[in-house]
Structure formats: structure tokens, C-alpha cells
């Protein structure tokens, strides 16, 4: 049997070789070269992290926070570079979700 860590490292290399991953890297690089998109991306990710942290802590978002999420989402959707990045991220997440399901299958079987 192969070493589990070798398999994990091989999986990492496989993910990096996926066309969807390479496309996502290209989209991220395009954002980095555009000041407006880069600033909006940072604002979006910072807000998203804060929002999720509050949710995990059991704090429900206020009406103002919900409105801010919608407003920020509209700004992101209006920016072509960010919209392309999020679409590419979604494409890669299909693979990652499938991989996660496969990896955790033995643990799920133990709980059944």
C-alpha cells in the first residue's frame, strides 16, 4: 500500500494540473493587475470572512449587514474580472466537492 501522504501530495499536484485550477489562477492574476478589481476583491473577501465568522459564532446578521452583502454582491457581479473569477472558482469547486465526498466516504460509512 502506498503512503497516504504521498497520495495526498499527488492529489495536490493533480488539482494544480486541472484546467479549472489553471483558469482560476489566471483570473486571480488578472484581478491583481486591475486596481479597481483588486480593491473590490479585497473588500469582498474581508467582508465575507467577517460575515462567516459572525455566523459561526451564532450571531445573526443585522438588516444593515444583509443589505451590505447584497450591495457588495451587486458590485462584484458588475465587475467582469470578479464575475469571471467567481465562475472559475465555482467550476473548480465541483471537483473539490467530489474529492471531499470521496475522501470522507469511509468516515461517513462509520456513522451509518
Swiss-Prot record:
Gene3D superfamilies: YheA/YmcA-like (1.20.1500.10). Signal peptide: none annotated. Pfam families: Com_YlbF (PF06133). SUPFAM superfamilies: YheA/YmcA-like. Belongs to the UPF0342 family. NCBIfam families: PRK13676.1-1 (NF010209). This is UPF0342 protein stu0643. It comes from Streptococcus thermophilus (strain ATCC BAA-250 / LMG 18311).
Amino acid at each position: 500500500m502506498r503512503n497516504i501522504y504521498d497520495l495526498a501530495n499527488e492529489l495536490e499536484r493533480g488539482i494544480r494540473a486541472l484546467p479549472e485550477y489553471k483558469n482560476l489562477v489566471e483570473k486571480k492574476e488578472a484581478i491583481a493587475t486591475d486596481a479597481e478589481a483588486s480593491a473590490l476583491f479585497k473588500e469582498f473577501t474581508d467582508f465575507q470572512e467577517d460575515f462567516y465568522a459572525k455566523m459561526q459564532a451564532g450571531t445573526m446578521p443585522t438588516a444593515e449587514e444583509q443589505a451590505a452583502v447584497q450591495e457588495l454582491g451587486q458590485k462584484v457581479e458588475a465587475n467582469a474580472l470578479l464575475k469571471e473569477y467567481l465562475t472559475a472558482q465555482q467550476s473548480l469547486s465541483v471537483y473539490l466537492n467530489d474529492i471531499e465526498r470521496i475522501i470522507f466516504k469511509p468516515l461517513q460509512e462509520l456513522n451509518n
